[in-house]
Amino acid sequence: MLPALRRGARAARRRRTADTPPTRRLATPSFQLGRLNHVALAVPDLAAATKTWAALGATVSPPQAMPAHGVTACFVGEQLELLEPLGAESPIAAFLARHPAGGLHHVCHEVSDVAAAARDLERRGFRVLAPPSIGAHGVPVVFLHPKATHGTLLELQEASGG
C-alpha cells in the first residue's frame, strides 16, 4: 500500500476508535437498565408541533419551560416528548442548527438510582455529559454522550418508585 494510503487508513482507524463506545471494563453494570420511558423529538416550533400531534388524535400536555435544561417541553401521550429551545444557548438550538426540520433527539430509559448509574458508567469509561439534574418529571436524569451509545443520545431517568 502506498505510504499516503497507509497514513489515511491509520487516521481512519483512529477516528473510528475515538467514536466507538468504550470497550474497556465492560463488566456487568451495578444497575439494571429499566423500561423505555420516552422518546424525545427536537422541534423548531412547539406550537405547530403540538397542533400536528393533536390533529393526529394525541393527547398533548401543556408546555413546560425548563430553564435548567434550556428547553420548553411538552408530552404527547405518555412516551413522546417534544422539545423546543429556550434561547440560543440551548442544546436543542444547537441540534436544530444541524437539523433545521427537527427530529429524534434522545431516548430515555429508567434506572432505579441515576446517581449510582452515572458513577458506575463513568467508572467503566462511558462519558456522562453532566451531573444528574432534575428533569421534566421532577426526578433526576443524566445524559450519556452519543459516541458512547452508537450515535444515540441516551437519557437515564430515575424511576418514580426508585
Regions from the language model: what does each represent?
Residues A88-I92, G161-G162:
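A short local loop/turn or secondary-structure capping micro-motif enriched for an aromatic residue
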Residues A4, R13-R14, D19-Q32, V43-P62, A68, T72-E84, L86-G87, H99-K147, ...:
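Vicinal oxygen chelate
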Residues P22-A48, G102-V111, S160-G162:
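N-terminal beta-strand motif that seeds the catalytic metal site of vicinal oxygen chelate
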Residues A27-T28, A93-L96:
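Short beta-strand/turn micro-motifs at beta-sheet edges
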Residues L36-V43, W53, V76-L83, I92-A93, ...:
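Short, structured motif recognition centered on aromatic/hydrophobic residues
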